[in-house]
UniProtKB/Swiss-Prot annotation:
It comes from the Viruses. Specific enzymatic cleavages in vivo by the P1 encoded 3C-like protease yield mature proteins. This is RNA2 polyprotein. Residues 213-236 are annotated as: Disordered. Keywords: Capsid protein, Host cell junction, Transport, Viral movement protein, Virion. Residues 221-234 have a biased composition (Pro residues). It comes from Arabis mosaic virus (isolate Syrah) (ArMV). Virions are comprised of 60 copies of the coat protein. GO terms for biological process: transport of virus in host, cell to cell. It holds the Pfam family Nepo_coat_N. Belongs to the nepoviruses RNA2 polyprotein family. One of its GO terms (cellular component) is viral capsid.
């Protein structure tokens, strides 16, 4: 047979020749060979056709000498016909023959003449051409009817046509089992109307050897014409696979819509084979009234309307064992109640047969409700109303909350038109179908509650707990919930809480498919409830039963799963907040604590002893206060004026002083990086007009500057939050890893000193009766940190600004009550350094914008009116260039907006240059050379008689949308670090630590550079990266006559015990040299102050310093230079 030689080129030739109906060029097929799976499939097919002559012609030659490697192109003539003539065409653009190979074969036939002589004649085979490509099949849809029912019917038809093939597959799957051999074949009407695309589908879903099929459908099913062959393509990309997944999701939504519209269609889905045991009384699932549940890890593919013949062989093999276990399990349950054995079986184990067939536990509509009239059917839509996939399962104290309405708006409107004003939920079913490995001990709990009830004890409907490794689990409850037709519009009728205590799977993996179904009916003033006797009996029995260990609930759980024992449920149902009126125009924010739903784990027994002692009932709900780490108080004087310093709270002292459970967790974890929630509790009062500021000072930079008078230049330069007295209790979130930049050690500080400063931004208009204080509560969960450094606040790059601004608050604008047509301006010199008296204050927002010369775009922000509720004003904000206008008619022609109740605004920056500068020259004024936001009081301010205090307004800028940035101030260039001059000694040595800092010297004059990079160092706590240093110097004497040099040495540790690294010596005549400096230590990052941590450092030694006129050091950040911990710095 010979050896075959494979290559991508030859496999592409083979695939192209054997798939001519797909089309595609040779180059496209060659690209397909890059997929290893496709290449292996083609190679396997070649192996199965080794005997073919054309295959041997293609693969028997060594690589490089075959017909596929012909320099003129693929020699199709030799591959297909065996001739030596090269296939006609341009080399490199060959195509295979468009007709079969045998059409060109010549058959030599032997014949004997009349004279007895043997002759030969040549004859070409006459092979007919294939039939022409038929046109695609299509069927138009009729116009929608003008009524709602006509629209629904048209929608049903459209969705039915889209899912035609799936429904036909289900019908084909049932035919061989529904009709045993020898019986006449009765084909359903839906099956006869099906249209199929390929003959393979018929042979796949139906046994073509059955003669009855030919009698019913001679020639097979009706087939539409074949569509045109698609062009060959490369393997699907990620985007194509994503689109296919979204299409499948849309099909699932279409199925849900059809179900909600009441369609009764076949659907191929997943169901479970029940285990060899059944429900017992000592189990794990709880419910408020009645529960029935079954589970099994094995699954198989069946139809939702499974025929009796499909489940017959399953029930026969398990019937004997099932009867024994039913007697053992139910006898103990019935013995503890007033029910008989048969009543208990009908109430709880009747669902086992439905699980076996893949059907829901809910009874059919015709069995649940009786018709209300002779010609009226049951007014219900039942079964599955919610299906979702669970991924990113919450663990610990996190709980996934799902809100949904069992009844759609269309259904409600339909029955409202019939005079029905209420809906009754008679039964609720929860089904959990897990994915993953059998025997997975991950527990999962689903709790169902009534969403409009604030008391969780009263809202509780039921819960279901299972192990994911035990397969499908189902539970059914009979709440009898009745509500108005208007309530479902609130989108929160039923609340589901999903949680796990020990989930360890990936966050992006799908754990389970959870389905929730309801059995419901619509009733009105003239309609009575029509619950059938079976459903009514189940409801009555569910309310009369009592569990053996849970109290006022029945525990029915699966038995015989792969995971032994029972899940321990721990679902945290989080609290909320609400507003409560406590006085005239005064409201209080009431925080509701979270609640814990707990089920203690216990072992199962196959049989329940009727003489066993009843255990102590465990509560299902308990009110807890979670995560309280510390507390403190802040005194407030009765006459609290603007700029008043109140108090500073140390975060570490608050936690350690409280000595709660979180402090113990902190000691155990050691290093933590928590997310703090600070709750400031104070009574609301809308008459004072006080606004406080809570400033988070992670590195203790502003404490000394606000001890007497708190200037907004400091309190608003660090992360801060506004506390309005009129709003009452306020909550603030502090991401410690982001705002501080690194983790906290439990026993001592490292770089940080986190403090909360409380100061007064706008003073009180009315003096209070006495001094008072408010309470500060600190909530956090202390878990061990995985690293020391947190999230960097800023990473240096040439295009770092994306338009978002945080904590950019303008000091209060005060409107005089006696002024009319007043205005206040906010300058857009956002890159200018703040000045407080003789000091400069560097903060992050100003430094970030100073990297650019100018900016344009849309300024978005919010206006906070901080005056008492007795004041009033109407504000219009516009953007203007070069001052303000005195022509009010012109003002209203400018683009602007009025400040509404929420205070938000969005104004495009107006400038003759389309941008406004971010800094100014010293001689320029802000009113003449920049754009401003002008807030015009077009009406007001007004206040009652006797009021004299000004009306304060605070503006916060949150974003500059669509920023039109100019060129950077220093694009990818060096920054000036320091200049040394006027040397007094010859031998000079400068020690540069592993940080960017302010260098000082007693033997020379030092001049520090002023640039955005040094400002960024100043307004952060830590920095880390690599600096490229460039040293340049000038000489005092003539060039060439000076002697001496500059020695640069890299060291690690200290001089006494450290290690020496690379070193270089540069002669003074070189006039400069370059090196690099690593910024950081063994912890990762360094502050800009001296610190005795083991790290690298640099020594610059001058042996003839007096010969130098000046030494200049430039620096440039390399790569991703990172800054951690947002703060400010005063110079």
């Amino acid at each position: 047979m010979g050896k075959f030689y494979y290559s991508n080129r030859r496999l592409a030739c083979y695939a192209q020749a054997t798939n001519r109906h797909l089309g595609g060029s040779f180059e496209q097929w060659l690209q397909c060979m890059e997929d290893s799976a496709f290449r292996a499939e083609v190679k396997a097919r070649v192996q199965s056709e080794r005997e073919e002559v054309r295959v041997r012609r293609l693969f028997s030659y060594p690589v490089g000498s075959g017909p596929a490697e012909d320099p003129r192109g693929v020699n199709w003539a030799y591959i297909c016909l065996g001739t030596t003539a090269h296939w006609a065409g341009v080399p490199g653009d060959m195509v295979p023959p468009p007709e079969p190979v045998k059409a060109q074969e010549v058959v030599v036939q032997r014949s004997v003449g009349e004279d007895g002589r043997t002759g030969y004649r040549r004859q070409c085979l006459n092979i007919p051409n294939p039939p022409p490509m038929p046109k695609p099949y299509s069927r138009p849809i009729g116009a929608f009817a003008p009524t709602r029912s006509g629209f629904i019917r048209a929608t049903v038809k459209r969705l039915t046509r889209e899912r035609e093939e799936s429904r036909a597959a289900a019908l084909f799957a049932e035919l061989p089992l529904e009709y045993p051999q020898g019986a006449p074949l009765v084909v359903p009407r839906g099956f006869a109307a099906m249209r199929w695309t390929y003959h393979a589908t018929w042979s796949r879903w139906y046994d073509t050897s059955d003669e009855r099929a030919l009698r019913t459908h001679p020639g097979g099913p009706a087939l539409p014409p074949l569509p045109p062959p698609p062009p060959i393509q490369k393997p699907p990309s990620f985007e194509e696979r994503l689109q296919a997944a979204l299409h499948r999701q849309s099909c699932a939504r279409a199925f849900a819509l059809e179900t909600s519209l009441g369609l009764n269609m076949a659907w191929v889905g997943m169901a479970t084979i029940p285990s060899t045991s059944v429900c017992c009384a000592d189990g794990r699932t709880t419910g408020g009234q009645t529960i029935a549940q079954e589970a099994d890890p094995l699954t198989h593919r069946v139809s939702s309307n499974t025929a009796p013949g499909r489940a017959q062989w399953i029930s026969e093999r398990r019937s004997a064992l099932r009867r024994r276990e039913q007697a053992n399990s139910l006898q103990g349950l019935a013995a503890q109640t007033d029910m008989t054995f048969e009543q208990a079986r009908n109430a709880y184990l009747g669902a086992a047969d439905m699980i076996e067939q893949g059907l829901p536990l809910l009874p059919p509509l015709r069995n649940a409700y009786a018709p209300r009239g002779l010609w009226r059917g049951p007014s219900t839509r039942a079964n599955y109303t919610l299906d979702f996939r669970l991924n990113g399962i919450p663990t610990g104290e996190n709980t996934l909350e799902i809100l949904y309405n069992p009844v759609s708006d269309e259904e409600m409107e339909d029955y409202r038109d019939r005079g029905m004003s209420a809906v009754v939920i008679d039964a609720l079913e929860i089904a959990i179908n897990p994915f993953g490995m059998p025997g997975n001990p991950t527990d999962l709990t689903v709790v169902a509650t009534y969403g409009h009830e604030r008391n969780m004890e009263r809202a509780f409907i039921g819960s279901s707990s299972t192990f994911l490794g035990n397969g499908l689990a189902r539970a059914i409850f009979f709440p009898g919930l009745q509500y108005s037709q208007e309530e479902p519009r609130r989108e929160s009728l039923i609340r589901l809480y999903v949680a796990s205590t020990n989930a360890t799977v990936d966050a992006d993996s799908v754990l389970a498919a959870i389905s929730v179904g309801t059995l419901r009916q619509h009733i009105g003033s003239l309609h009575s409830r029509t619950v059938a006797s079976s459903v009514h009996a189940a409801q009555v029995q569910g309310t009369t039963l009592r569990a053996t260990m849970m109290g006022n609930s029945v525990v029915v759980s699966p038995e015989g799963g792969l995971v032994s024992g029972v899940p321990e449920a721990n679902v945290q149902i989080g609290g909320g907040s609400s507003m409560r009126m406590v006085g005239p125009l005064a409201w209080e924010n009431v925080e509701e604590p979270g609640q814990t739903f707990s089920i203690r784990s216990r072992s199962r027994s196959v049989r329940v002893d009727r003489n066993a002692d009843v255990g102590i009932a465990h509560p299902r709900m308990s009110t807890t206060t979670r995560g309280l780490a510390g507390r403190g108080t802040v005194p407030v004087p009765k006459d609290c004026q603007a700029g008043k310093y109140l108090k500073t709270l140390d975060l570490r002292d608050m936690v350690s002083g409280f000595s709660g459970i979180q402090y113990e967790k902190w000691i155990t974890a050691g290093l933590v990086m928590p997310d703090f929630k600070v709750v400031i509790r104070y009574p609301a009062n809308a008459f004072t007009g006080i606004t406080w500021v809570m400033s988070f000072d992670a590195y203790n930079r502003i404490t000394s500057s606000i001890s007497t008078t708190a200037s907004p230049a400091y309190t608003l330069s660090v992360p801060h939050w506004l506390l309005h007295h009129k709003n009452g209790t306020t909550s603030c979130d502090i991401d410690y890893g982001e705002l501080c930049g690194h983790a906290m050690w439990f026993s001592a500080t490292t770089f940080e000193s986190p403090k909360l400063h409380f100061t007064c931004l706008t003073g009180n208009n009315k003096e209070l009766a006495a001094d008072w204080e408010f309470v500060v509560e600190l909530y956090a969960e202390f878990e061990a940190a995985k690293s020391f450094l947190g999230k960097p606040n800023f990473i240096y790059s040439a295009d770092a600004f994306n338009g978002s601004l945080k904590f950019l608050t303008i000091p209060p604008l005060e409107y005089d009550l006696s002024a009319t047509s007043a205005y206040k301006s906010v300058s857009l010199l956002l890159g200018q350094t703040l000045v407080d008296g003789t000091h400069k204050v560097y903060n992050f927002n100003n430094t970030l914008l100073s990297y650019y010369l100018g900016i344009g775009g849309i300024v978005k922000g919010k206006v906070h009116v901080c005056s008492p509720c007795t004041y009033g004003i109407v504000l219009r904000v516009v953007s203007e260039w070069n001052g303000v206008t005195n022509n009010w008619n012109q003002l209203f022609k400018y683009p602007g907006c009025y400040i509404e109740e929420d205070g938000s605004f969005a104004i495009e920056i107006r400038s003759p240059y389309h941008r406004t500068p971010l800094r100014l020259i010293d001689a320029q004024s802000a009113s003449s050379f920049t754009s401003t936001l002008n807030f015009y009081a077009i009406s007001g301010p007004i206040a009652p008689s006797g009021e004299t205090a000004k009306m304060p307004v605070v503006v916060q800028i949150e974003e500059i949308a669509l920023p039109d940035l100019s060129v950077p101030s220093f694009p990818n260039d060096y920054f000036l670090w320091v200049d040394f001059s006027s040397f007094t000694v010859d031998v000079e040595e400068y020690v540069i630590g592993s940080r960017f800092f302010d260098i000082s010297s007693t033997t020379s004059t030092v001049a520090l550079g002023d640039n955005p990079f040094s400002h960024m160092i100043a307004c952060h706590g830590l920095h880390h990266g690599i600096l490229d240093l460039k040293l340049m110097w000038d000489l005092e004497g003539e060039f060439g006559k000076s002697s001496g040099g500059v020695t640069i040495t890299k060291l690690c540790g200290d001089k006494a015990t450290g290690m020496d690294g690379a070193s270089r010596v540069c002669a003074l005549q070189n006039m400069g040299c370059e090196t690099e400096l690593y910024i950081g230590n063994y912890a990762g990052a360094n502050p800009n102050t001296a610190l005795s941590l083991y790290s690298r450092w640099l020594a610059i030694k001058l042996d003839k310093a007096k010969s130098m006129k000046m030494l200049r050091i430039l620096c440039k950040p390399r790569g991703n230079f990172e800054f951690y911990g947002r703060t400010c710095f005063k110079v």
